[in-house]
């Protein structure tokens, strides 16, 4: 059953990521990997909320964990795309954008997880 839940969550997470990437490219352009940045930061925030809620309710080994954490958020966020897009920025000579993507993703991602945990503990 857990594989089905992970697969279903992954299907939904991958489609949500595709929608975010498409939306970001349409609204913000493609000179910076905005979509991946937004997906990774919002995914970090959602992960923080989910971990706090699941931990506080002793549900870390529950079916919801497989669906949400391994499935949905595992497919929604994407480290491999982040690293590839960062490499492309550096190769294109956009060093400032490359550094902004790497440092911003890590720093803001950590902040997003922290804020998500704080918010999740309110529930």
Model-derived features with residue positions:
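Membrane-interface helix-loop junctions in multi-pass transporters/channels
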Residues: 1-123
């Amino acid at each position: 059953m857990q594989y089905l839940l992970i697969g279903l969550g992954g299907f939904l997470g991958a489609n949500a990521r595709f929608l975010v990437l498409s939306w970001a490219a349409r609204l913000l352009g493609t000179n910076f990997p905005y979509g991946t940045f937004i997906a990774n930061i919002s995914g970090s925030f959602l992960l923080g909320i989910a971990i706090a809620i699941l931990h506080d309710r002793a549900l870390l080994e529950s079916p919801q964990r497989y669906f949400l954490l391994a499935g949905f958020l595992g497919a929604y966020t994407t480290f491999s795309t982040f690293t590839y897009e960062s490499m492309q920025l550096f190769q294109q000579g956009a060093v400032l954008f490359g550094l902004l993507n790497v440092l911003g993703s890590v720093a803001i991602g950590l902040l997003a997880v922290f804020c998500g945990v704080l918010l999740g503990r309110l529930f």
